[in-house]
Amino acid sequence: MLSAAIVAGAVPGAAQAGPRFDYRQVFTTSAPGASTGIDTQILYKHPDDPDAKPIPVRQEVFTFPVGTRFDESVVPDCTVSDLQLQLQGVSACPAATWLGSGHGNTSMTGFPGAGENPVLVNAFDFGSDRFRVLGESEDLPLRFIAHGEGTGRTRTVDVPATPGGPPDGEGALRRVRNIFPPRSAGGRAAVRTPRKCPSSGTWTFKARLTFADGGVERNVHRMPCRRRARRGTAR
């Protein structure tokens, strides 16, 4: 499962910065072995000018900390076609299939003076470790669907090209903050944190992003986790 999300300005806190994107990804709890949500934040940047329209991203690959467990059976599947989801929007999927949403997400067209445009984002389970991310422009009658798939502790999202302006005729994601809240059913958790907090005191999240020009950039974010107190030695 994945995620991406936004705040006014750069990604806050101890985000890891690279030439093409700043990255922060965390669980919503620091407790080991607990049901958790996922909070993903990315600020996309052009490597030659951090204030310009970014080079469009084509694929996002997120690798979660060692020991992270996913349970596909917790959230029901939204099985409508991509076309129906695009035409009908959020209402096409049953509420129980919703995974999470964007908070302050934006994109850029590249047209002079256009700046950043708000994007509404909602994600739905699609079954068989797959999910779909529905993006909707707040200013234009435009919806797009990004397909995601999970393998082990890795989640991959393929981002479609969208219409835009110069220099490439495409739109580009700028700010992303996607929050997937915790989900559980019958003692099962859709996502569960690793059983242990390692001796480093942090869990490591990794991102590998591929861009329209063929560029690939990797980044890492380390989240503090809660170590269990050692039992006292009996005398």
Predicted regions and their residues:
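Sec-dependent N-terminal signal peptides
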Residues: 1-5
